[in-house]
Amino acid sequence: MLAVPEMGLQGLYIGSSPERSPVPSPPGSPRTQESCGIAPLTPSQSPKPEVRAPQQASFSVVVAIDFGTTSSGYAFSFASDPEAIHMMRKWEGGDPGVAHQKTPTCLLLTPEGAFHSFGYTARDYYHDLDPEEARDWLYFEKFKMKIHSATDLTLKTQLEAVNGKTMPALEVFAHALRFFREHALQELREQSPSLPEKDTVRWVLTVPAIWKQPAKQFMREAAYLAGLVSRENAEQLLIALEPEAASVYCRKLRLHQLLDLSGRAPGGGRLGERRSIDSSFRQAREQLRRSRHSRTFLVESGVGELWAEMQAGDRYVVADCGGGTVDLTVHQLEQPHGTLKELYKASGGPYGAVGVDLAFEQLLCRIFGEDFIATFKRQRPAAWVDLTIAFEARKRTAGPHRAGALNISLPFSFIDFYRKQRGHNVETALRRSSVNFVKWSSQGMLRMSCEAMNELFQPTVSGIIQHIEALLARPEVQGVKLLFLVGGFAESAVLQHAVQAALGARGLRVVVPHDVGLTILKGAVLFGQAPGVVRVRRSPLTYGVGVLNRFVPGRHPPEKLLVRDGRRWCTDVFERFVAAEQSVALGEEVRRSYCPARPGQRRVLINLYCCAAEDARFITDPGVRKCGALSLELEPADCGQDTAGAPPGRREIRAAMQFGDTEIKVTAVDVSTNRSVRASIDFLSN
C-alpha cells in the first residue's frame, strides 16, 4: 500500500490507484477545518461501476404535484389500483372557456408575509384589492423560472413580488407546496378515511429535465420545509423530469386519445382491425374514461396501441413545451419490459409560453413607453395582473388560420393612469406610435390583427423549432420518426401548426395527446408507481474531484509540479466519476474509498467539480467549476476495533454514488464496522 506523504496541506483522500495522493485545495478556493485528503488505499485501479437494484420505499398512495410556471395541480393513485389516476378537484374561479383542472401558479401573502391564498383565489383576491392596499401585499406569479435562471442559486436566494418587495425563494416555494399538500391530504382522507397519513404517501415533484442539480435540490429543500416528507424519510419524495413523465404517460395512450398533426391515424388503421373492445369490462373503462364528470382516468395495464406497434430499438422525441421552458428528451424503447433508455442528454431552453407574454409587454412598451409600463406595474400591480389575464384569454384563441381582429380589454385603471401620467389618452398614444397593427376601440379595447398576434409567438416558436432541429441533427438520435408534443403551451394552435410545417416535411410524425396540458401530471403519477421505467439516462455534465497524481514529465505541465519529501506530484488533477453524455444505468454505482485526514475526525467534506467537456484534465481548466460538496458524517470510532487490515489510525469510508437517477445520490459505509454512514451531496453551498 502506498504511503501517504506528509503534507501540511488540507486535502481529501480517495482510494483508487497507487498514482493518487492528497490534493491541496485549489487556488482561491475556501479551505475548511473538516476537509480531508485523498489517499490511495489499495494498489489497484478504480473499481468499475456496479449496478445495484435501487431500494424502493413502501407506500400506499402516490401523489404527484406538477409545479408549473403558469399553472399547477396534483393527481394521485393508490398502490392497490395504480391504473386509476384521480385528478384533483376542479378549482373555483378561473377564466371563461379554460378548463380548471389546474390552477394558476400564483401565490398571495399578506403584508406581514403570512400565507393568504394560492391559485385562482389568490389571483382574484389580489385583483379585487384597492390599488393602494394592493401595493402592500406580496403577490408572486410565474416564479418557477427564477430558479432556472439563477446562476448562483442558494437557500438564501430572494424572489421579488409584483410590488417589488422580496422574500426568500425557499419560503415562497414552500408556501405553494404546502398548499397542495393540505389539499391532497384532505381529499385522500375523504376518499379513504382509514388510510394512515404518516409514511404512506409517496410524493412526486415535477421539474424540467434541463434543470441542474442545484435547482433539483432546491425543490427538495422546499418540500422538506413544506412538510411533504422529512429528511429522515427522503426516499418518500421523488423528483420526476417533466418530459420523462410525459413519455411514461404516452406509453399508455390509445389511438383515439392521440392527434396526429399530419392528418394520419396514429396507428395507421391496422390496430383497429386487430383489436376490439369485446368485454363489458373494457367497455366500462371506456365509458369512465370519456365521462366529463369523472375525475378518475384509467390507463392501460400494459402499453397503449401505438406502443404495441413499436419494436425494440424504436426511437422518439418528447418535446415538453411548458410555460417557462421547452424540454427535449429522446427515448429508445426496450423490450420485453417496455423500459426506456435515454439516447441524448436533456436539452432545451427558456422558450415557453411566458415568452409570448414578454413579447406583448414589449409591444406595450413600444406604444406607451417603457418608463410608463414600469411605473404602472410598480404603482398599479393589481391592474397589471388584470391586463395580463385579459391577454392570456386572447392568446389562447390565436391560431394560424383565424380571421378577424382580437380585442384585448384595457383596465380602466390603465387608461386613467396613462392620462394622468402623460396628459393625453391612450388613443392618442396609439396614433403617435409606430405600431400600425394595433388599433383603439371606443369600447376600451386594443384591437390587434391576427397576424400581429401570431407575430408575438414567433420568437418563442422559432426557438422551440430550432432546438428540435438541432437535436435531430445529432448522430446519437438518428432514426427518430415520432415526436410527442406535450405541455401546456402545446395546446396552442400556432405552435402545433408551426412544428408540423417545419418537421412534417422531413418525415417526422408529430403527435399530440388530447389532454396535452395534463400529460405530465398523469405521467408523474405513473412514474411514482414505477420509477424504474427509465432504465438508462445520460449524464448532462462531467463530475469528479481533484487529486494528486505522480508527476510524469512530458505529460504533466511543469507549473503543476509539487515536490514533497523528495516525491514529485502533479496537483489539481481532475479525477472523473462520470463523463458528460455518458450512459448511466439506474442503480449503477461509482465507488470510492475515503480516509479522514486525522484520527477522531467526525466529518469528511470533499469538493465536487463539474464541467461540460468530457476530456478535462485539471480542476483549473476553463469550464471546470466547483459545483458541490460531498459530506460524510462519522460516528466516533471504537478504540481497538478491527480495522480489516488497515494501518492503525486509518479509517476507511466507502462511498457509492449513483448518477443514473433523476438526482445524484450517495450512500456510504464504514468498512471497519460495516455500518452505514450518513452521506449527502450539497449543490447549494456555493
UniProtKB/Swiss-Prot annotation:
Keywords: ATP-binding, Nucleotide-binding, Phosphoprotein. The modification Phosphoserine is found at residues 25, 29, 44, 46, 276. GO terms for biological process: angiogenesis; endothelial cell migration. One of its GO terms (molecular function) is ATP binding. InterPro entries: ATPase_NBD. The modification Phosphothreonine is found at residue 42. Coiled coil: none annotated. Residues 12-53 are annotated as: Disordered. It comes from the Eukaryota. Highest expression in muscle and heart. Lower levels in liver and kidney. Belongs to the heat shock protein 70 family. PANTHER family: ALPHA KINASE/ELONGATION FACTOR 2 KINASE (PTHR14187), HEAT SHOCK 70 KDA PROTEIN 12B (PTHR14187:SF39). This is Heat shock 70 kDa protein 12B. It comes from Homo sapiens (Human).
